């Protein structure tokens, strides 16, 4: 469970419910199956906590949950999660494919 302090509230978000995170300027947005949470933070602060939970930084602005990926468009460097298209850095596409293959093998076994 990830705890996020936003103004006067603290949200408790199940890591498994997180689809992806995106950052724009100083606003970090967490997209989940149940809603969207936006607050002031940097991606680095949260990234280290989520890497061990099959999350991957595919672009400077995006951190994705590998277990939620529906499709990878290698030609256009785009990953799809629940109808959302997310840009993948061309420098990270190969590593993303490896990570996805690793996750899929872990799930199948």
For every predicted segment, state its role.
Residues 1-81:
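Conserved binding/recognition cores within well-folded domains
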Residues 82-87:
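Short, conserved aromatic-histidine micro-motifs
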Residues 1-8, 90-109:
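Eukaryotic intrinsically disordered, low-complexity regulatory linkers and tails enriched in Ser/Thr/Pro
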């Amino acid at each position: 469970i990830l705890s996020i302090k936003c103004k006067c509230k603290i949200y408790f978000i199940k890591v498994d419910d997180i689809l992806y995170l995106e950052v724009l300027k100083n606003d970090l947005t967490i997209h989940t199956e149940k809603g969207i949470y936006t607050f002031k933070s940097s991606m680095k602060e949260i990234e280290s906590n989520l890497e061990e939970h099959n999350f991957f930084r595919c672009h400077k602005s995006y951190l994705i949950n590998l277990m939620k990926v529906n499709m990878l468009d290698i030609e256009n460097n785009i990953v799809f999660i629940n109808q959302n298209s997310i840009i993948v850095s061309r420098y990270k596409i190969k590593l993303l494919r490896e990570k996805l293959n690793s996750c899929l093998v872990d799930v199948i076994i």
